[in-house]
């Protein structure tokens, strides 16, 4: 993540939060395409990983724009969209902060 600390917890062990920069998020959606050599389950898992990775990268990019070096309290939402449920949408969000070594 290019030096960005990311965590689902509201704090980071050994770090002191010196500034809260606010809410950041990343959203991504990917169509599920089943390749002739894979089964449907594998296709959905691949699409989910792709959309999670993209959403996380977008969230980190948004935090960097604010001057953050960490994101705390990360959470995510998932949805199947499209007429046939053939698209996975992922939203990842958290709080951008600036941290320094505690002590």
Curated annotation (Swiss-Prot):
Pfam families: YbjQ_1. InterPro entries: UPF0145_dom_sf, UPF0145_YbjQ-like. PANTHER family: UPF0145 PROTEIN YBJQ. Belongs to the UPF0145 family. This is UPF0145 protein MJ1413. It comes from Methanocaldococcus jannaschii (strain ATCC 43067 / DSM 2661 / JAL-1 / JCM 10045 / NBRC 100440). The lineage of its organism: Archaea, Methanobacteriati, Methanobacteriota, Methanomada group, Methanococci.
């Amino acid at each position: 993540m290019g030096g960005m600390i990311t965590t689902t917890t509201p704090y980071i062990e050994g770090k002191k939060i010196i500034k809260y920069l606010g809410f950041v998020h990343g959203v991504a959606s990917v169509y599920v395409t089943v390749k002739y050599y894979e089964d449907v389950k594998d296709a959905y898992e691949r699409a989910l990983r792709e959309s999670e990775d993209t959403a996380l990268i977008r969230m980190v990019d948004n935090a960097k724009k604010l001057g953050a070096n960490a994101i705390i309290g990360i959470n995510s939402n998932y949805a199947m969209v499209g007429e046939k449920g053939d698209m996975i949408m992922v939203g990842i969000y958290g709080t951008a902060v600036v941290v320094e070594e505690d002590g």
